[in-house]
């Protein structure tokens, strides 16, 4: 049967990590390993998970508040080392492909707004064969990172969609603050 109900939203924007991509546990372990590599106090799972969705620099500065700000990029390199060694283990949450196909069939614009880097998102999209599924994406190294609303505002402007016709779907308070 065909669904003729009017759409409530034209643009649906997804967070990536922890929303579509089952990556939370790996990100937490990589943050903890990076801190250990530099001899820093290892943040708890809760503290490590809390920063997911922020840009990497902001996230690492938050979990390692005693680290000299000039050394945050070094911590980022250690995080990336651990993450890129294991990212091949990650996958989409069950039902994600079917949900995206159903939304596409209803003619929604689909987008991603993430705290990941452009390289990280592109590699993840390639890994799960979703490279051409989204109409637009924004990453933390291209625009203001969450919780700043700029990436969401840019996506709405790109499609000419008003906020009341836009739905942001995420898994953290950083996503809700957009």
Task: Tell what function each PLM region has.
Residues 61-98:
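Metal-dependent phosphoesterase signature
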Residues 10, 101-102, 109, 135, ...:
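Structural signature of beta-strand start/N-cap positions in the alpha/beta core
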Residues 34-35, 55-69, 124, 155-156:
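Helix-loop "lid/cap" segments that line or gate small-molecule binding pockets
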Residues 84-112, 118-122, 149, 153:
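Short, acidic loop-to-helix structural element flanking the phosphoryl-transfer center
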Residues 13, 20, 92, 110, ...:
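Conserved SAM-binding loop
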Residues 89, 117-169, 173-178:
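Substrate-recognition "cap/lid" segment bordering the active-site pocket of phosphatases
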Residues 2-50, 64-69:
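Active-site neighborhood of HAD-like aspartate-dependent phosphohydrolases
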Residues 8, 30, 44-47, 55, ...:
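Hydrophobic alpha-helical segments typical of transmembrane helices
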